Structures are given as structure tokens and as C-alpha cells.
Regions:
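Transmembrane alpha-helical segments of polytopic membrane transport and secretion proteins
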Residues: 1-38, 294-307
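Glycine-rich helix-loop "coupling/hinge" segments at transmembrane-helix boundaries
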Residues: 161-164, 176, 191-192, 233-234, ...
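C-terminal transmembrane helix and the adjacent membrane-cytosol boundary/short C-terminal tail
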Residues: 162, 169, 179, 225, ...
């Protein structure tokens, strides 16, 4: 079999800044993605500037204003302990979108949901690439284990993991990564099975490149489009899962302003005519997930047009 000199020498790669510029142009050209970006950007702004946009702290209590409706003093009302709901939403947005709290005195940038998705991407992409490129018994063994994990309902799997390792921000990250790994691995495997048949992969094999070089330098970058879109969707799913775990009492431990825990604490007062403590965090979760899904849908739609 003959391979052209250009194929053997490899494909000329587009400079990174041009790839970034093209991605930004795709994002900015989509009205759907821009609508989602505005929603997510609003909550990111609220999370970053939480200490400056409210005169209260998330744990400050006013026993004279328990379950108070929205007013000039408390724009979204208060919960059953007299804590300002807007303040708690703002500080909750910090955990959801800005920082990952390790303990009371230490935190790292980038949010709980994103760390979980990134960890799942690393593990899932590695397993998917190895399975697709190596094939045989390795592929069968890895995929059957992941299929067994996917047989569990997602929320049940989250509950099993958190119940086993305990509830904390770091453990929620691990749970998000574990639950997301099978789906990511199957996506990457399907993309890699298609890409590994391309001429430039055969050219790399003829050049004698290391299998890991082929997997992570030749195959993975050419699968990045669908992976990025899937990752954005998974961040939304992870935020929804964090809210569900908080509602079930398995989320971030108190006194964290966990949106799911806020819904759980306020639901008992809905029928008594005080829905505010449950209503606003529910809308916050819904709006954020919708915003992320709009970004992913817009990117997917515009990427298809550019192909």
C-alpha cells in the first residue's frame, strides 16, 4: 500500500489561536448559544460578587422576618430561619459556578460540577480511546464494566456513591465523575472507532508512532467538537444532580447555601402560603441548566453548519 508524502509527513495543523477564534465565532454567531451565555454569565457574575451584592451573610438570621415575602429589605424574601434568600442564592451560585470548597478555610477555583465533569472526561476519554484503538479483550472488558454501571438509574447510583463515601464537595465531585465516566467513554469510543480508519491515522502507524501518541495527539483532538458539546450538557446534568442530592439531604453539608437543600427546607411551607424559600432556588437551578443546554444546542447547531 502506498501513502502520499503529505500523508506520511502528517496533516498540517491549524494554529491554536485560529481554532480558538473559530470556536468563539461559532459561539457568537448563534443566538441560542448567546441566550444561554447571558443566563450562565448572570449567575457567574452573581457568584463572583456575592459578598458585594447583598448587605447580609448567608447564615445571618432575622427572627422578626421568618418566611417573609419579597420586600425592599429582602428582595426575594426570607426562609424559615429569617435568612435572606437572595444572599443564600448568591453564595450558593459561588459553589455551583465559581469555587470548589475543600474545607471551611480552603477552596480552589472552578466549580464542583465542572471539576466532576473534567475528571469524568479524563477517565472516560482514556478508557474510550484505549478500548477503540486496542480492541479485542481490553475493549470488551472495559465496555462490559461500563455497561453494568449504566444499568443503574443515575440518581440511584449517585445516592449509593454519596452514602458510601459521605457528603462533601470533594465527594460530590467524585460522584459526578464516576456517574459520568461510562457515557463519556462510550461517546469517545464511537468517535475513535470512526477516526481510526482515516488515512492520517494509518500514516501515523506507518511512521511508527507510539499508540498513545496516536490516541491522544491524532485521534482525541479530532473528536473534540462532540466531546465539548457533550461536556457542556453534562455540566448541566451535574448541577441538576447536585440540586437533587441536596434536596434528598445528600448534598453539601450545612451551613453551605446548597440550592437543593434550600428547596428541601422551604417545601414544607408551600401549602401554608410561603413558597418563596422553595420557589427561588428551584428557578435558579432550572434557569442555569437551561442556560447550559442552550449553549450546547447553539454550538451543536452552528458547528453542523460549518461542516
Amino acid at each position: 500500500m502506498t501513502v502520499s508524502e503529505q500523508s506520511v509527513q502528517g496533516i498540517v495543523r491549524t494554529p491554536r489561536w485560529q481554532r480558538v477564534s473559530k470556536s468563539l465565532s461559532i459561539l457568537l454567531s448563534s443566538k441560542i448559544a448567546m441566550a444561554g451565555l447571558i443566563i450562565v454569565g448572570f449567575w457567574v457574575f452573581v457568584g463572583i460578587f456575592a459578598p458585594y451584592i447583598s448587605p447580609y451573610t448567608p447564615t445571618e438570621q432575622d427572627y422578626r422576618a421568618q418566611n417573609a415575602p419579597p420586600s425592599a429589605e429582602h428582595i426575594l424574601g426570607t426562609d424559615d430561619l429569617g435568612r435572606d434568600i437572595w444572599t443564600r442564592l448568591a453564595y450558593g451560585a459561588r459553589v455551583v459556578l465559581v469555587i470548589l470548597p475543600i474545607n471551611e478555610n480552603f477552596w480552589i477555583p472552578i466549580v464542583t460540577a465542572i471539576w466532576g465533569v473534567l475528571l469524568g472526561l479524563v477517565v472516560g476519554s482514556t478508557l474510550g480511546l484505549i478500548g477503540a484503538y486496542m480492541r479485542g479483550g481490553i475493549d470488551e472488558g472495559v465496555m462490559r464494566i461500563l455497561d453494568a454501571m449504566m444499568a443503574f438509574p443515575v440518581i440511584l447510583l449517585y445516592m449509593i456513591i454519596i452514602s458510601a463515601i459521605g457528603s462533601s464537595a470533594v465527594n460530590v465531585v467524585l460522584a459526578i465523575a464516576i456517574v459520568g465516566t461510562p457515557g463519556i467513554a462510550r461517546l469517545v469510543r464511537s468517535l475513535a472507532l470512526d477516526i481510526r480508519t482515516r488515512d492520517y491515522i494509518r500514516a501515523a502507524e506507518i511512521r511508527g508512532e507510539n499508540p498513545f501518541y496516536i490516541m491522544f495527539v491524532e485521534i482525541l483532538p479530532n473528536a473534540r467538537g462532540p466531546i465539548i458539546i457533550d461536556a457542556l450538557l453534562r455540566v448541566g446534568y451535574a448541577i441538576f444532580a447536585m440540586g437533587t442530592l441536596g434536596f434528598l439531604g445528600l448534598g453539601l453539608p450545612p451551613p453551605s447555601s446548597d440550592w437543593g437543600s434550600m428547596v428541601a427546607g422551604g417545601r414544607r411551607y408551600i401549602l401554608s402560603g410561603d413558597p418563596w424559600a422553595a420557589l427561588w432556588p428551584s428557578l435558579a437551578i432550572a434557569s442555569l441548566v437551561i442556560g447550559l443546554n442552550l449553549i450546547a444546542d447553539g454550538l451543536s447547531e452552528e458547528s453542523t453548519r460549518y461542516q
